[in-house]
Amino acid sequence: MIDPDGFRPNVGIVLMRQDGQVFWARRVRRDGWQFPQGGMNTDETPVEAMYRELREETGLLPEHVELLGATPGWLRYRLPSRAVRRNERQVCIGQKQVWFLLQFTGDESHLKLDHTDTPEFDHWRWVDFWYPVEHVVMFKRGVYARALRHLAPLAQSLAGPAAVGAMPERALEAWLPGSSAAGHDSPRKRPRKRNGARAMRINND
C-alpha cells in the first residue's frame, strides 16, 4: 500500500520502561539498531497495525503495555536512492509513519524476538530516551528526532524530567533544517516547547 506521493503507511513503536529507558533492537544479520516499526495493511487502523507489529517483532501482547500517546498525523522520511526499487509498478520512495509511545508493564520474560518464523531482530537492550536519534541509520535520524520530540512530554510525565530531559543539542541538529538527516517534512524554524497534552488524534490521509 503506497500513497500517490510514493510513501508507504507505517507505524513506529517507542517501548519505554517507567524509568525512561527505551527498547532498542538489532536487526537480524545486520549491524543496524532501531525501534520496532512496520507497514500497515489496507484494512488496518494505525493502532491495529501497531499492536500487530508489536507482537510480531517483540512477542508482546496488549496486556504487556499501556498506550500513552501517539504523534499527531504522519511523519515522513525518504529512503536513500540505493534502496528505491525503480522497476516496481508502484515506486516507494519512503515511509509515512505514526509513532506510538507505550509503557512496558510486563516482565522481560515476555519479550520474544523469535515469535515469528522470520524475526526482525536478534538482540535487544534498554537505552536512554534520546540515544536512538544519534545512533539509528542516518536517513532515519530526522524522523526519530521529530517523533521523540512529540512524545517527550508524555515520557516525562511518566518517568520525570530528570530521566528523559530535554533533547540534546546533537539530536536537535537532526531536527533542524539544513541537516542531512532532517528528513522529508522537517520544520522551517527552530521548534517551540510544547505542553504535555496527549496527542492521540491521527490523520489518516
From Swiss-Prot:
Residue stretches in coiled coil: none
InterPro entries, per the entry: NUDIX_hydrolase-like_dom_sf (IPR015797), NUDIX_hydrolase_CS (IPR020084), NUDIX_hydrolase_dom (IPR000086), RppH (IPR022927)
Cofactor: a divalent metal cation
Segments forming domain Nudix hydrolase: 6-149
Motif (Nudix box): 38-59
Family matches, as PROSITE patterns: NUDIX (PS51462), NUDIX_BOX (PS00893)
Basic residues: bias regions: 187-196
One matching Pfam family: NUDIX
Enzyme class label: hydrolase
Enzyme Commission code: 3.6.1.-
Task performed by this protein: Accelerates the degradation of transcripts by removing pyrophosphate from the 5'-end of triphosphorylated RNA, leading to a more labile monophosphorylated state that can stimulate subsequent ribonuclease cleavage.
Protein name, as recorded: RNA pyrophosphohydrolase
